[in-house]
Amino acid sequence: CDNQAHAASGSHATGTTQPLARTSVRPSGKLRHPKHFPLMLMYSGAEYVATASTSHPADLERKIKAACSRLPAFIQILTPCNPSWGYDDHKGIEVSRLAVESGMWPLYEWKDGVFQLQNIPRKATVKDYAASQRRYAHLTESDLQLMQQYVGDLDSMLGKLQKGFSG
């Protein structure tokens, strides 16, 4: 599970903390792009690699079943953290859904040598996603444009992977 913070140590940034997200040691926001551990493991020979989200339980269940039959396997599951992210207690699933629907957390899997990017409709914007959490309260319009550019760059990279491995 990935909550993009070291919550037990006061919400320090991790390698997977999203760009511009405020952490306890970087109140102005993390400047580096996150590491994409699933892609690293895919290139390292894992038989099954996927991303998932608590907002899409049927997809998560399907991926867990697929991972159990292919070892080594890795699933990176987005799990929002209320203290680190700063959202209302009852909105964890909604925040997770916004991450997926805005493109900040793409869903994909690598199985049997095929990379498959899931086609999730973009019903939310990066601005919607950022507005759902206090860790992004400091962002300016320019910052939001940078986040949107990050999503575009990520979409482009993953699209090339899908075309290259599966086309």
Model-predicted regions and their roles:
Residues 9-20, 37-43, 90-94, 113-123:
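Noncatalytic linker/hinge segments flanking ATPase motor cores
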Residues 1-67, 73, 81:
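Conserved thiamine diphosphate
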